[in-house]
C-alpha cells in the first residue's frame, strides 16, 4: 500500500488525488481516474513530494536527453560530437540524433522530439548495425 498524493497540472494546481506516485509511468493515460475534459497523460513525477504531474500529450515530447553510467562498446570514449541513431524505448525505431560528450556521460540531441524519454531508462546509440554504447537517462529537456 502506497501513500495517496496529488495529481497536479503543469501550473502546479491540484486536479485530483492518486494512490501513490510509484504506481504511475511517464506517458501513461489509462487508469488515472481523472475527468478533466480532455485526455491527460503523466508528464512527470516527484517521488519526494509524492505528486504526479499530468498534461496534454504534447507535454511528453523532449529533444534532449542526458545519460550517465555510460558503457562504450564500439568506441573507447566519446571525445567529440557524433551523428548517431538512438533509442530510448525497447521497441522504438532508431531515431536520428547527435551525441555530445558531457560531464559524467553524454548529451543526446534528437533531430525530432521524442515521446516520453524517461529518467532511469536506457539510451542506446548506434551507427548502422553497430552498437556504439549506451547509458542511463538522468534528465530530459525540451
Kindly give the residue locations of the regions a language model identified.
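AMP-forming adenylation/ATP pyrophosphatase catalytic core
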Residues: 1-142
Amino acid at each position: 500500500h502506497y501513500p495517496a498524493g496529488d495529481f497536479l497540472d503543469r501550473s502546479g494546481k491540484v486536479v485530483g488525488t492518486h494512490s501513490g506516485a510509484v504506481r504511475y509511468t511517464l506517458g501513461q493515460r489509462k487508469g488515472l481516474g481523472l475527468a478533466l475534459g480532455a485526455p491527460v497523460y503523466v508528464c512527470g513525477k516527484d517521488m519526494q513530494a509524492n505528486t504526479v504531474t499530468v498534461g496534454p500529450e504534447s507535454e511528453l515530447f523532449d529533444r534532449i536527453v542526458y545519460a550517465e553510467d555510460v558503457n562504450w562498446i564500439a568506441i573507447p570514449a566519446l571525445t567529440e560530437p557524433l551523428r548517431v541513431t538512438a533509442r530510448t524505448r525497447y521497441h522504438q525505431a532508431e531515431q536520428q540524433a547527435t551525441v555530445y560528450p558531457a560531464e559524467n556521460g553524454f548529451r543526446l540531441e534528437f533531430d525530432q522530439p521524442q515521446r516520453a524519454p524517461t529518467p532511469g531508462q536506457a539510451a542506446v546509440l548506434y551507427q548502422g548495425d553497430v552498437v556504439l554504447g549506451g547509458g542511463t537517462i538522468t534528465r530530459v529537456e525540451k
